[in-house]
Amino acid sequence: MVSTSFRAAASFIVISAFAAAGVDAATESGRFAIEGAGLATCAAFTQAREQRSPDDKNAAAVDSYARFIGWVEGYLTGVNRYLGDTFDIAPWQSAELYGVIIGEHCEKNPNERLFEVVQKMVITLTNDRLKQPSDMVTLKLKDNKGENRGVTIYTEVVRHAQDELKKQGLYRGEVNGQWDEDTQKGVAFYQAAVGLQDTGLPDPLTLWLLFSPQKTQLDAAAAAAKAKNKK
């Protein structure tokens, strides 16, 4: 399940991102057929997301939600294939984050179709897409509770994170895409500053906040802190 702080922090970003993304209706020259789950309504997506559970008793809901997320990932793969100057449209985002982004929008727009929402999401992702192939590195750390955590990430995303951390005075090393102790500490400092668990791992929510406009970061940090205090 997605944590309350994850959900609260992401919601501020989702609202502002979709507000700026407005997608026009298809024109005669731009019409295309929508396959499968893309025609489902936001209401159906929200229902499947709310009912999903690892419990076998809710296997149907799990399958339904997985079908929606699978459609989203397939759509994004198509974007990677056909959008010019693009290798990966979503280089650090995860299925969990897709669910939060789409879910927050769908709760407020129940009659929209899934494909419309995903089109809008793609527009918000375009500026931060990975344009060229990049090596990947798997990072494994123990969090403050001694639990093992890991993430696989592009070295180009590490470089981008180092650059943003340096701009905020949280990292003084080289911006070279190489993961090291200083980079880990910089990520942890940033996470603590915005109210996230300071694992030091560049997880999707951390990167989403880090790469977002400063005002959005502050709003999201306030939401995360508020949610954290309610636990």
Protein language model features and the residues they cover:
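Bacterial N-terminal signal peptides that target proteins for export
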Residues: 1-10
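Terminal, positively biased "leader/anchor" segments
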Residues: 2, 20-21
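Bacterial N-terminal signal peptides
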Residues: 9-19
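Cell-envelope/ECM-targeting effectors and their regulatory/trafficking segments
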Residues: 22-231
